[in-house]
Amino acid sequence: MKKIFIILISLLIANSAFALETPMKKLSKYFKNGELIKILSYTSAKWPNGYMSIKDGSYKNNPIEVDAFIAFPKKGEGPFPVVMFAHASGGAALFTDEWFKFNRLAAKSLLKKGIGVMFLDNFSARGQRHTYKDQSTISHWSTVMDAFKALEYLSKDPKVNIKKVGITGWSRGGAISLMASEKRLRDALISKDLYFAAAQPRSPPCWSIGMFVNPQPIKENKTWMVLGGADIFTLAKDCVKLGEKYKANGADIEVTVKKGWHHGFTANYEAEYEGDNATFNECPGAFTNDEGIIIYEGNSAYPDCIKWGAKIGGNKGGVFKKPFLKFFTENLL
């Protein structure tokens, strides 16, 4: 056991050599009683072997400590429900960005209702600020591992009602929030009695990142996925189809498509074209089969199928906040 511990510490030191300082320090400006914490997680193998490294346990060869910021309600002693916020490809800096206020405003409202909040930084510990120009720099499997390991961390905190933990995010964070309901991942990574009670993904990439072609949902999870009907960054139709597979396999899932809404619709600016984001809608669809192998749909070829630019924004945060809060209060309180 001592030898294993020494090896783990050595690997953590080696993997932290390129770590960046988390931008979430700035969250203390908005949440005075919050604190930065470190969570032991892991980095998966690179594409296309990300899930296979989880399935066979080899992910354990790459431990890493990721950053998180947690805040509890000022009133009461708990245990409290908690909502976890997962960021998009723009990284954890979006949590304090002046043009992306929705998450922290929603978090403040949740705290007032008696629900704790946690913000998760998937990128800084892995030496990246963002991934929107090159999504391959950090795998989606690594980031969903972070979410499950954060759930495991919360299970050891007496201030947390571990049966009432939710998760939310948009784009990459939406993918994490949707995949957080996957039984195969939970069972491989943490105790089988842990689960996210509620998940609210927005505009996840359902076509190109290796989502399970035959999802196995955790029965205790309730998911509300919200999509932009005008989103050309992550197409709504692909997530509607995936949502139908979840429901057919027993998931408690509702999918809502908002007509005319674009990618990142909760950003507090009107939708505008941004040209430095890669889109993969014309690329072959990539999915993970029951054996853990990536399979493809379509005949187009990389890298010619990759396009650049899409409209992002929409200033819909004010409209969306009320049903967002209702979803979590109904399912966590």
Regions found by a protein language model. Name each.
Residues I4-I13:
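Sec-dependent N-terminal signal peptides
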Residues K55, S139-K219:
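Primarily recognizes the serine-hydrolase "nucleophile elbow" in alpha/beta-hydrolase
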Residues G78-S89:
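Short beta-strand element of the alpha/beta-hydrolase
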Residues D252-L333:
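C-terminal catalytic histidine-bearing segment of alpha/beta-hydrolase fold enzymes
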Residues A86, L120-N122, R202, K258:
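Alpha/beta-hydrolase
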Residues S191-G260:
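The feature captures the conserved acid-bearing segment of alpha/beta-hydrolase catalytic domains
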Residues S89-V144, E182-A188, A267, S300-D304:
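Cap/lid segment of the alpha/beta-hydrolase catalytic domain
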Residues L20-G78:
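N-terminal cap/lid segment of alpha/beta-hydrolase-fold proteins
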